């Protein structure tokens, strides 16, 4: 991983190991940020994404990649953290059961803490409100509200060194995201998007995340390097 110099600006980037967050790392790097990536081992059934996140961080030259352990399966309430709840394999009405309660709020809070320690003022997250599953913590209103909270709740914020929550994919279609990442050199074969990925990172091809990914590559006119089981 690359070395940091005192002249470089720092950013903390939430990196799940999926398509969207990998694209965000590449975007931040292209803007000249020294990238500090953060992933979470939160009890998710698709733990293969953690290996993918490490690969992406290494490939895109993150200064440091940090994995935080959380026990969100102790709370449950989601098909991603409770093995007794099946992952839906067809679209459904409303917010799907793959929504993890307060996940992005928790993740951004920990990223905020790390950013304050690092002296970073920008936090990147790969949320999208166009081609997405309808999660409430992916909407622009959430991002804007969290930024306001961040600047009220931190020493840096109240001392005038405010934080910006960057969500560069917010209004892009999935195909636009794929094209943007490809133009920036993202190797999407390193990523894992599937909610039911096996230990080797192979995808089911049936869940909502697989569907959105497949549609994105198809609309972009590009081959999807996803491996399936």
Swiss-Prot record:
Gene3D superfamilies: HUPs (3.40.50.620)
InterPro entries noted in UniProt: QueC (IPR018317), Rossmann-like_a/b/a_fold (IPR014729)
Domain of life: Bacteria
EC number: 6.3.4.20
Disulfide bonding pattern of the chain: none
Pfam families documented for this protein: QueC
Molecular function GO terms recorded: ATP binding; ligase activity, forming carbon-nitrogen bonds; zinc ion binding
Metabolic or biological pathway: Purine metabolism; 7-cyano-7-deazaguanine biosynthesis
Reactions it catalyzes: 7-carboxy-7-deazaguanine + NH4(+) + ATP = 7-cyano-7-deazaguanine + ADP + phosphate + H2O + H(+)
GO biological process: queuosine biosynthetic process
Record keywords, A-Z: ATP-binding, Ligase, Metal-binding, Nucleotide-binding, Queuosine biosynthesis, Zinc
CC cofactor note: Binds 1 zinc ion per subunit.
Residues annotated for ATP binding in this entry: 15-25
Cofactor: Zn(2+)
Residues annotated to bind Zn(2+): 194, 204, 207, 210
Function in brief: Catalyzes the ATP-dependent conversion of 7-carboxy-7-deazaguanine (CDG) to 7-cyano-7-deazaguanine (preQ(0)).
Family: Belongs to the QueC family.
This protein's name: 7-cyano-7-deazaguanine synthase
Gene: queC
């Amino acid at each position: 991983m690359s070395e940091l110099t005192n002249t470089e600006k720092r950013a903390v980037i939430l990196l799940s190991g999926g398509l969207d967050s990998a694209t965000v790392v590449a975007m931040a790097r292209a803007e000249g940020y020294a990238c500090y990536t953060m992933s979470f081992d939160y009890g998710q059934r698709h733990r293969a994404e953690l290996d993918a996140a490490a690969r992406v961080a290494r490939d895109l030259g993150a200064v440091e990649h940090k994995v935080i352990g959380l026990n969100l399966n102790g709370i449950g309430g989601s098909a991603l953290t409770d093995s007794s709840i099946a992952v839906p394999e067809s679209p459904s009405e409303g917010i799907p059961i793959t929504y993890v309660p307060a996940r992005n709020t928790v993740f951004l809070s920990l990223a905020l803490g790390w950013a304050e320690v690092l002296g970073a003022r920008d936090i990147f997250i790969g949320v999208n409100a166009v081609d997405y599953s309808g999660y409430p913590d992916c909407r622009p209103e959430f991002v804007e509200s969290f930024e306001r909270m961040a600047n009220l709740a931190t020493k840096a914020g109240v001392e005038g060194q405010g934080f910006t929550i960057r969500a560069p994919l917010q209004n892009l279609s999935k195909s636009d995201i794929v094209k943007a990442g490809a133009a920036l050199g993202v190797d999407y074969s390193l990523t894992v998007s599937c909610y039911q990925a096996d230990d080797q990172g192979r995808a089911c091809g049936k869940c909502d995340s697989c569907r959105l990914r497949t549609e994105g590559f198809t609309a972009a006119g590009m081959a999807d390097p996803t491996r399936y089981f």
